A protein has these predicted regions:
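Conserved mixed alpha/beta catalytic, RNA-binding, or beta-rich assembly cores of soluble enzyme
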Residues: 3-15, 19-63, 67, 71
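Short alpha-helical linear motifs
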Residues: 45-52, 90-97, 116-119
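A structural-propensity feature for long, helix-poor, extended segments
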Residues: 56, 63-106
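Secondary-structure transition/hinge residues
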Residues: 15, 105-109
Length: 138
């Protein structure tokens, strides 16, 4: 699942930085079904970044700042994903979401996570690849 990939990458970064996470964290990413980008209007990768911020900030529906931080993260990731346009590419959207989250965590939590250099090698396998419009296309 796409959200599992984004979630997993971000949590791996936390582990490297010795940031403690609640045990049920990874289960949240599994709750986002495939295809939500087209059917719900919100990419699962973008949603996962908000879940990630929710967990590291201790957000709940009743908390002020953490709740806002989580929702702002989701909106930033979805804006970055949506700005490129479709059709969807789960790899591209995951990369964009991860980079958005890394930047957001640095900005809002003063935590520096390793930002990957990404060059896509999958365009030949994706009939809907947008090629030059994709920031990761080789």
């Amino acid at each position: 699942m796409l959200s599992d990939l984004v979630f997993g990458k971000l949590f791996l970064q936390c582990r490297k930085l010795n940031i403690r996470l609640i045990p049920q964290s990874l289960n949240r990413g599994k709750a986002v079904p495939g295809g939500v980008c087209g059917f719900w209007g919100a990419c699962g990768a973008g949603i996962s970044t908000g879940m990630f911020i929710s967990i590291i900030s201790g957000a709940t529906p009743l908390k002020n700042e953490p709740w806002g931080l989580a929702n702002k993260m989701t909106s930033k990731a979805l804006d970055a994903i949506g700005s490129i346009g479709g059709p969807r590419c789960c790899k591209r959207d995951s990369y964009i979401a991860i980079i958005s989250a890394i930047d957001y965590v640095a900005e809002n939590f003063n935590i520096q996570m390793e930002k990957p250099v990404i060059k896509c090698i999958h365009s030949d396998k994706n009939n809907q690849c947008i090629k030059e419009r994709c920031p990761f296309h080789e």
